[in-house]
Amino acid sequence: MAKYMLIMRSNDEINAKFENIDFAEMLDTMGSFNDELMRAGVLRAAEGLEDAKDGVVVDFGGEIPVVTPGPYGETAALFNGFYILEVASIDEAVEWAKRMPMMQGAKAEIRRVPGIDEFPQDNEFIQREREWRERTGQL
């Protein structure tokens, strides 16, 4: 089994379609999908994000990081939320992604999350992280 992150991508035009949607309806729709993932035993994490205009961007392009309010540049590719699933293959992750609700016109990016065992085990910082994960029940 491997972990995959399903990244929900959108843009201003797509987000505008959902501005007037009933919030309770949205919660029910997303909650139903989340229930399916939980019943299948594949859901490890899921979070939606606040509007990009309420966030900040830290730009490391110069000598000193620059903090800018709101979305960075064009909002042609907003990151609206994510799922982390533990499934047998990227193909299975793709099948789950195809079922994500409320994605009309949007995109889902799927990326594998490497496990800690895939990193050099003799590295001091990997050892510290492994100990932290064991201590916090995240391993």
State the predicted function of each range.
Residues 1-139:
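Conserved, structured core segments of small domains
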